[in-house]
C-alpha cells in the first residue's frame, strides 16, 4: 500500500509536509510514538527516547527549531538498534546522513545540515506546551505510512475496518487502471475520468 493510495483514501490529506526519505527504496509502516523538542535544543529528545516502545515509528516534532539538525547517527542508532524502533520521521532537519544511510537506518526528514541543535536544557513555554499537547494528541498512536513519496499519517479515528476496506478498494482500482492503460491500450481519459471499465463489467 503506497502513501498515494492512503492519502487518496483520506480525501488527499494526511501528508507530513516536507518530510522525505534520506535514501531511496525504503518503506515503513507502523504505530507512531510521539517525541518532541523545541527552541534549538535536543535535550528533550534524549530524555524521551529512553522510554520508546518496540517496533514503533518515532515521530520527532521540532517546535520553534530554526534549521538545525535534531540529531544524527548516534541518536538514530540508539533509537533503531537499541530501542528497536522501525523508523524515524520528522518535519525537521537531520545530520550524519551518510552514516545513517550506511547503517540502513530508515529516516524521513525535511532536509539535512551539518549544524546540530544545542545539547542544552530549555524551559518549555506555555505556548510550546500547548502546541506539543495538540500535536501529541494527533500523532501519538496514529499509523505512519512511509515510502519514496514521503509520509502519510492515518489518524487514530480512521483506524477502522471500514477504512481498511476503502484502502483495498482504491488499491484494486489502481490495478484496474493500469490494466486498462497498459494492456487494453485505453487512454487515461477513458480510464480515470469516464471509468469505461465499469460499462464493460456490467455487460
How would you label these PLM feature ranges?
Residues 1-140, 154-188, 192-203:
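Feature captures the catalytic cores and cofactor-binding loops of soluble hydro-lyases/lyases
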Residues 139-151:
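Conserved beta-strand-loop-short alpha-helix elements that form
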Amino acid at each position: 500500500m503506497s502513501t498515494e493510495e492512503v492519502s487518496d483514501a483520506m480525501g488527499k490529506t494526511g501528508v507530513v509536509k516536507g518530510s522525505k526519505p534520506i535514501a531511496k527504496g525504503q518503506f515503513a509502516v507502523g504505530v507512531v510514538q510521539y517525541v518532541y523538542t523545541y527552541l534549538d535544543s535536543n535535550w528533550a529528545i534524549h530524555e524521551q527516547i529512553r522510554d520508546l516502545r518496540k517496533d514503533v515509528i518515532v515521530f520527532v516534532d521540532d517546535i520553534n527549531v530554526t534549521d538545525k539538525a535534531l540529531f544524527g547517527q548516534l541518536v538514530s542508532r540508539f533509537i533503531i538498534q537499541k530501542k528497536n524502533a522501525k523508523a524515524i520521521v520528522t518535519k525537521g532537519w537531520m545530520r550524519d546522513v551518510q552514516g545513517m544511510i550506511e547503517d540502513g537506518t530508515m529516516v524521513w526528514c525535511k532536509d539535512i545540515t551539518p549544524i546540530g541543535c544545542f545539547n542544552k536544557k530549555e524551559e518549555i513555554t506555555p505556548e510550546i506546551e500547548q502546541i506539543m499537547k495538540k500535536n501529541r494528541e494527533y500523532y501519538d498512536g496514529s499509523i505512519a505510512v512511509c515510502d519514496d513519496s514521503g509520509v502519510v499519517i492515518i489518524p487514530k479515528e480512521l483506524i477502522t475496518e471500514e477504512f481498511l476496506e476503502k484502502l483495498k478498494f482504491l488499491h484494486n482500482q489502481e490495478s484496474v487502471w493500469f490494466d486498462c492503460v497498459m494492456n487494453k491500450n485505453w487512454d487515461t481519459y477513458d480510464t480515470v475520468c469516464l471509468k469505461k471499465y465499469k460499462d464493460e463489467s456490467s455487460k
